[in-house]
């Protein structure tokens, strides 16, 4: 198990484990196996991963936070809380948007565009 040095990466794609509510059309078992308290567990893990991985990003680097969830608790709530706690982060609006704009990112809703639901938010670490 190799330990990575802080500020090692220019860019990171953080596709976190989630409730998979955006892919229920293809995976209907999600409706049966998910419990209400699963969302809180996923949210805690997502927050922990985001805070941990942020340390690996170089100044000037970009991190794309992504889920296959349509739940705000796993998306904007995680990013908003992170931005409130991490003063070296800000969200960036992507020039080419897919989905509906949210406070901190973009949400793709399956019933609107077809396909799977997902969320993404681009976070930037300022140069020192």
Q: Where does each model-flagged region fall?
A:
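Glycine-rich S-adenosyl-L-methionine
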Residues: 30-58
